[in-house]
Amino acid sequence: MFKVKKLNLESGGTQSVIMSKQNAYGMNVNVADRVEIFWNSGSLIAVVELCERTVPPGTVGLVKEVWENRNIPDEVHVRSMPKPASVGYIRERLMGQPITPEKIREIVFDIMHNKLSSVEAAYFVASAYVQRLSFGEEEALTRAIVEAGETLSFPKKPVLDKHCIGGVPGNRTTPIVVSIVAAAGFTVPKTSSRAITSPAGTADVMEVFSNIKFSNEDLVKIVNEAGASLAWGGSLWLAPVDDILLKLRYPLRLDPPSFLLASILAKKFAVGTEKLMIDIPMGKKVKDMASARELAGRFKNLGSRLGMQVEVLITDGKQPIGHGIGPVLEARDVLEVLQGRGPSDLREKSLLLAAKLLEMGGRPDSQQLAQQLLDSGQAYQKFKAIIKAQGGNPEVTLEDLVLCTQIHDLSATEDMTSVQYDSEVLIQLTRMAGAPAIKGAGIYLHVLPGGAVKKGQKLITVYAGDDTRLKTVQDYLERHSPVLACQRVLESV
């Protein structure tokens, strides 16, 4: 028997147990080996870490991932366990060998149930760089991710959805597109992510308007009531192993296309999507047209294997879209476009995407219909219905969407006929200001890309979360310009 010491430490996802070297060597286990911790009413598998002082002999230290959601007694039994067979399957992939759907399913199952360490699971992701997953392996991975969670079904068909692979500051088309398409009578169970490296995700923006965290049962009720949802996927038991894989990919920014494809399509498949429109902005993430076309083809191929119609739009992702970057500022853009105003570039792209999705739903008059639903206010009414169903205030106004009060303005130092922004600098500035954690932090672009500006005219306003963040922003701006070299006025005659 071992005494239990609950440690206020997180391992980053791995179920770890910390043992004294004396106890570990006595059991013939070493670092990264596995042990089973068991007691009268339960058990778990944990990965061993060794120490000399933190945990004395006769005691096991449990990280928060192990004890936080379990009723573990003060004393437990511990015994050594062999490495799971899935470790060998990962080694096969690293050696360039294809693996069967059954082996992929077992790897995903073991990741889901914490039988693999984070290092071992990360090697599975990295194996896609050694040799790209085949079409069959991509399908097997996607289906295994879906099988590890629950699936939803909606009575009203067809079920439509859209996804953007990201990389463009602002670009908050999703709430507008979903509202337009749902206003046309289609079912759109949209779930979105929070920001990881960007200034805001769709979930962060929607949290400005309403609750975004729901159970699977609640999501079904919302969609059946409002015709659509704009919820956070992380609170749902839909493809939960994908969230584990995303955490593994984040530290080294591992983003192999096969895992990107499986991640996106697994979550769409889990909510019963039949027709999916993918937006691939060519710019930061996808560098050229050849790469964009290849990725589009792979999306369509995998979608077909899953019985899903996938259509892809390759769009220009080199410049930000909309006036705002950051949760509240982007929420303001969304509200203004739905109310018939707002930035023209965001409106135009939203109409383009909505028309494509309506066309996929069988509406040949898709362009005219999308514009009519937006201009008539029907899309706005649908957005309000979604907000209400999600527990928010459907009568929210721009004045209710409060910005941070620490402000820094940046003005043009010369006349320019066509302003172009450095998206990477804008992203860094917005995160330095406090977004997405501080909802009212971000950047407002007074001049949209391509617009003309006079010397001394205000270009950008930064809203920072506090004095310290404001100072960080100001220091950064002394070394980096958010404006790229662009067309300047040489002479006025």
Residue ranges, per PLM feature:
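Glycine/serine-rich anion-binding loops at beta->alpha junctions
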Residues: 159-182, 186-198
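A glycine-rich helix N-cap at a beta->alpha junction
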Residues: 205-229, 297-303, 307
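Phosphate/diphosphate-binding glycine-rich loops and adjacent basic-rich segments that engage nucleotide
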Residues: 226-273
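General beta-strand structural signal in soluble alpha/beta enzymes
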Residues: 161-162, 188-192, 215, 230-234, ...
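Well-ordered secondary-structure scaffolds
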Residues: 96-106, 111-113, 151-153, 255-256, ...
